[in-house]
Swiss-Prot record:
GO molecular-function term, one example from the UniProt record: mannosyl-oligosaccharide 1,2-alpha-mannosidase activity
Protein name: Mannosyl-oligosaccharide alpha-1,2-mannosidase
Family to which the UniProt record says this protein belongs: Belongs to the glycosyl hydrolase 47 family.
Chain positions recorded as Ca(2+) binding sites: T507
Record's subcellular location: Secreted
Known partners and oligomeric status: Monomer.
Cofactor: Ca(2+); Mg(2+)
Function, in words: Alpha-mannosidase involved in the maturation of Asn-linked oligosaccharides. Progressively trims alpha-1,2-linked mannose residues from Man(9)GlcNAc(2) to produce Man(5)GlcNAc(2).
Pathway named in the protein's UniProt entry: Protein modification; protein glycosylation
Top-level EC class as recorded in UniProt: hydrolase
UniProt source species: Coccidioides posadasii (strain RMSCC 757 / Silveira)
Family annotation (InterPro entries): 6hp_glycosidase-like_sf, Glyco_hydro_47, Glycosyl_Hydrolase_47, Seven-hairpin_glycosidases
Superkingdom of the source species: Eukaryota
Coiled-coil positions: none
Amino acid sequence: MKGSPVLAVCAAALTLIPSVVALPMIDKDLPSSISQSSDKTSQERAEAVKAAFRFAWEGYLEHAFPNDELHPVSNTPGNSRNGWGASAVDALSTAIIMDMPDVVEKILDHISNIDYSQTDTMCSLFETTIRYLGGMISAYDLLKGPGSHLVSDPAKVDVLLAQSLKLADVLKFAFDTKTGIPANELNITDKSTDGSTTNGLATTGTLVLEWTRLSDITGDPEYGRLAQKGESYLLNPQPSSSEPFPGLVGRTIDIETGLFRDDYVSWGGGSDSFYEYLIKMYVYDKGRFGKYKDRWVTAAESTIEHLKSSPSTRKDLTFVATYSGGRLGLNSGHLTCFDGGNFLLGGQILNRDDFTKFGLELVEGCYATYAATATKIGPEGFGWDATKVPEAQAEFYKEAGFYITTSYYNLRPEVIESIYYAYRMTKDPKYQEWAWDAFVAINATTRTSTGFTAIGDVNTPDGGRKYDNQESFLFAEVMKYSYLIHSPEADWQVAGPGGTNAYVFNTEAHPVKVFSRGC
């Protein structure tokens, strides 16, 4: 059963059974009009994802709540995100979208009791912003809007905003630097930092959506102004050598001078969500963030011209290379695979067919990294440099078009995320099939008795070593995107061609309400 593309379980049995989360049986030999386009099939799949979410939530609730995450092999709690209950806060927007009032109430009660001024560990401004601040602001927007029926006491919703303000006030000393570029690693108890003189492109450039939204809701401009000041150095990069191609910049910034220290260009970890937020800020408010859009367009066009790459053995696949010191790096990874969805969003909002076409090519390439492995799950890292193929992977590279450089999978969402965008832009049911196959593979290989765990090797049939960790983004992202692609139209769904987005997803998949003059 492990590694199989479909678990043959009766479609009616959408409850949990001891060994697996029950999934509807899909006959791959049926005509596509039945197996791919049936509303009944989509409903069954959405319910199966919802059942998997509840299974993981109950395991976390029993063995780890109110800690940050569950270690789902040893069934012990972990606190990698300051002990404030990251899995609960990250799960909230998904529980709202899945219409789970009991889960929503439990998390709201928990959030009301968090003391964000207290922690025993260093605090990441970036991670705290995207998971905690983004999770609470998103839930506030949703529960004040399409999810309002889920909460009987409006005061519980107002607590989300109050706690968001308290958290931002705890964190804002990070911006108290000579340039306004924030420090990332913070000791919030004594308002000190780890002493680093640099910050990263993504960790600096992935704050502006959440902090701006907080200002817009509250009417206090301070929060957005802080994030936008740090961002301003990224929009006007210096020195010129740090921008080897128009719009594409290095990933390390000097906090004291605002100057970039390198020219390493990537859409992967360390850089990724800076580019992601450039176009998303324009989706959020076209009136204020036109320059962000212009920089994204410039970066996107340069990416197509300079970084687009295909393996020598699979010219049908498209990946995005890295660049530094005059040389392309023919390597990528799971984190980079958000890029297809980001290009598709840009194509939709700007009516640019070239971005849409390239986005679909990237989705195809990243899905191929899933389809080729023994588990049908993609690896953390991969390459396609024909001069660097490991001897043991020569045949694999010939057939797959890539070789694995880092074999683990820690429940990352980016491939399913981009497949979701592809479906929203095309309504081609093949993307629902791809997302379903990925979800089934994750369920088959990473599931434990209480949740889902990171695995050591996606190219061994059982996934290899179980790493005994369940990241909070399983709840926020993997489950949400897997559910949304099979779900009916709703305000929070990404708009297709010609449509208008009512929400924009932060990098942790928390939907933030698009700005309007009435907020």
